[in-house]
């Protein structure tokens, strides 16, 4: 569980760096866009799409720990209020246990969403940068492919890391699911009746 929380913190920091890097390139290429009025509208449209993808990306936060709601001290509180408070605490603890059991599955979904969003926003960002840089050079120079840029290589490395983490989380979820099924199967098995076992012992020749 600690490893998953550390991973989410690392992903959040990496995504904040990518966002700051996007805004840095935006401020850096503004003079180039102003020097070419023909390509200004096209570049601004792509930039708006990229910023919309970045803004719509939301990380799924881990479920917070359940906190017992204690209104009054035990000395001044009524017995009914204390009983109600203990029941609410037990319900919250049960919900916390269920959320912890569903944590690997939620983490797999959030990592998958993050992978898709990173690919979409990164590809649009690389295409936007290549189109803006092509507007600043002459038409005789051939435009470099977006896949050969350092940004695309960085995006590919981030995607590989997310893919490895997603694979590990899926393996953890499957292991937890097998353990849960085995636990349910053991508790659901019929227990032998002690009266029948005594009769069988009495009928046995030994």
UniProtKB/Swiss-Prot annotation:
So which domain of life are we looking at? Answer: Eukaryota
Entry comment describing in which tissues the protein is expressed: Expressed in sperm (at protein level).
**Main localization (coarse):** cytoplasm
- For region Disordered, the annotated ranges are 180-206
Instruction: List the coiled-coil residues.
Output: none
Task: Name one process (GO BP) from the record.
Answer: spermatid development
Against InterPro entries, the record matches this protein to: SPACDR (IPR031534)
Q: Name one GO cellular component term.
A: acrosomal vesicle
Q: Does the keyword Translocase apply?
A: no
Q: Does the keyword Ribonucleoprotein apply?
A: no
User: What keywords sit in the KW lines?
Assistant: Cytoplasmic vesicle, Differentiation, Spermatogenesis
- Where can this protein be found? Cytoplasmic vesicle, Secretory vesicle, Acrosome
The disorder this protein is implicated in is: A variant causing a frameshift predicted to result in a premature termination codon has been found in a patient with globozoospermia.
* Cited function: May play a role in acrosome formation and nucleus shaping during spermiogenesis.
Name of the protein described by the UniProt record? Sperm acrosome developmental regulator
Organism from which the protein derives: Homo sapiens
Gene it is expressed from: SPACDR
């Amino acid at each position: 569980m600690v490893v998953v929380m550390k991973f989410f913190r690392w992903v959040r920091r990496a995504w904040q760096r990518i966002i700051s890097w996007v805004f840095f390139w935006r401020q850096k290429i503004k003079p180039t866009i102003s020097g070419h009025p023909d390509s200004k509208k096209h570049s601004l449209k792509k930039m708006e799409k990229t910023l919309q993808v970045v803004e719509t990306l939301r990380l799924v936060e881990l479920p917070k720990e359940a906190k017992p709601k204690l209104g009054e001290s035990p000395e001044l509180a009524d017995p009914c209020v204390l009983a109600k408070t203990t029941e609410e605490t037990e319900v919250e603890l049960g919900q916390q246990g269920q959320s912890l059991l569903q944590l690997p599955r939620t983490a797999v979904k959030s990592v998958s969403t993050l992978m898709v969003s990173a690919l979409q926003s990164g590809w649009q960002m690389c295409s936007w940068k290549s189109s803006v840089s092509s507007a600043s050079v002459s038409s005789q120079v051939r435009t470099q492919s977006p896949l050969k840029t350092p940004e695309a290589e960085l995006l590919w490395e981030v995607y590989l890391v997310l893919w490895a983490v997603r694979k590990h989380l899926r393996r953890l979820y499957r292991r937890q699911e097998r353990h849960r099924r085995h636990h349910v199967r053991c508790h659901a098995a019929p227990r032998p009746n002690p009266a029948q076992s005594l009769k069988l012992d009495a009928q046995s020749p030994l």
